Amino acid sequence: MDNCILEIKNLSHYYDNNGNKTLDNINLKIKKNEFITLLGPSGCGKTTLIKILGGFLSQKNGEIYFLSKEISKTNPNKREINTVFQNYALFPHMNVFDNISFGLRMKKTPKDTIKEKVKTSLSLIGMPKYAYRNINELSGGQKQRVAIARAMVMEPKLLLLDEPLSALDLKMRQEMQKELKKIQRQLGITFIYVTHDQEEALTMSDRIVVMNEGIILQVGTPEEIYNEPKTKFVADFIGESNIFDGTYKKELVVSLLGHEFECLDKGFEAEEAVDLVIRPEDIKLLPKGKGHLSGTITSAIFQGVHYEMTLEIQKTNWIVQSTRLTKVGEEVDIFLEPDDIHVMHKE
């Protein structure tokens, strides 16, 4: 990877003497100007990894190369890496200008340069008239923008963001997702973003790193992670999934609930037991007798954009999402195209 900005090699970390690893042999390459997201449930190790990359915590084993230089023993203030924390970490006794300019003033930057850089940063976050506003007069979203501006004004080559939007309400969070992606593209800074929110990761990322229990399970584009999960955990964690036991009968044919379906996945043995992943939005409902398998709708909930229905087929429950309502008690068939079925090896 010629345009690699950060490489993590065989990195492990544990907090106790029993060797229970918070991070277990992490290997990852990150490209320049990339928006990459560390995604996983609470306790998976993503925040620990961010702290290590920022220099706030030392790993037990492994190496970190930033612009081809090993930085494990480099102090945080000597790394061209800045961090935006979940709690903003703004100075309440300083106004917006002083908060954003704090790092520049510590570096003895000339006053005229500071003024120009802060002005540019405020414009970039859409707050050009807020320079002398007190921090306690700002909304949560505005505080987060100021925290981001304070990090960006130092012109880091890499920006770490540790769940920065988690305290915001849904609408503000969605607006800030768009703003962050826009800012990242304008500045050309590499972002490493931490979240447990799948929608956030899918919306903003160039690539997603899915983590669980201190290990990396899969790295890929949002489309790859969503459409081609490599493990049952990834399939279940990213969006909603129907995951069933099936059999890979022969090349490009699987069996599920006694019916054979065509599929697109290869690399399996004949008669191999497999996991079959079917997304709720990919299931087509047809009149009884017109599809592959028959079942009965047992629940239907309106969720704004679509209806989410539960379909019982041979004592298995299927989650189905559709813009058209099928009433509870109605008998229907399902129809699946080959690309609606994703085949995975059993773990």
UniProtKB/Swiss-Prot annotation:
Q: In which residues is ATP bound?
A: 40-47
Main location group: membrane
Alphabetically list the UniProt keywords.
ATP-binding, Cell inner membrane, Cell membrane, Membrane, Nucleotide-binding, Translocase, Transport
Class of enzymatic activity (EC top level): translocase
Name the Pfam families for this protein: ABC_tran (PF00005), TOBE_2 (PF08402)
Q: What is the disulfide pattern of this chain?
A: none
GO terms of molecular function: ABC-type polyamine transporter activity; ATP binding; ATP hydrolysis activity
- In this chain the ABC transporter domain maps to 6-238
What reaction gets catalysed by this protein?
ATP + H2O + polyamine-[polyamine-binding protein]Side 1 = ADP + phosphate + polyamineSide 2 + [polyamine-binding protein]Side 1
CC per GO annotation: ATP-binding cassette (ABC) transporter complex
Keyword Cell inner membrane in the entry? The reply is: yes
Q: What is its EC number?
A: 7.6.2.11
SMART domains linked: AAA
Subcellular compartments: Cell inner membrane
Classify the protein's membrane topology as the record does: Peripheral membrane protein
Give the multimer and partner information: The complex is composed of two ATP-binding proteins (PotA), two transmembrane proteins (PotB and PotC) and a solute-binding protein (PotD).
Q: Which PANTHER family match?
A: SPERMIDINE/PUTRESCINE IMPORT ATP-BINDING PROTEIN POTA, SPERMIDINE_PUTRESCINE IMPORT ATP-BINDING PROTEIN POTA
Its annotated function is as follows: Part of the ABC transporter complex PotABCD involved in spermidine/putrescine import. Responsible for energy coupling to the transport system.
Concerning its family, UniProt says:
Belongs to the ABC transporter superfamily. Spermidine/putrescine importer (TC 3.A.1.11.1) family.
Would you tell me the protein name for this molecule? Spermidine/putrescine import ATP-binding protein PotA
Organism of provenance: Borreliella afzelii (strain PKo)
Q: What gene name does this entry carry? A: potA
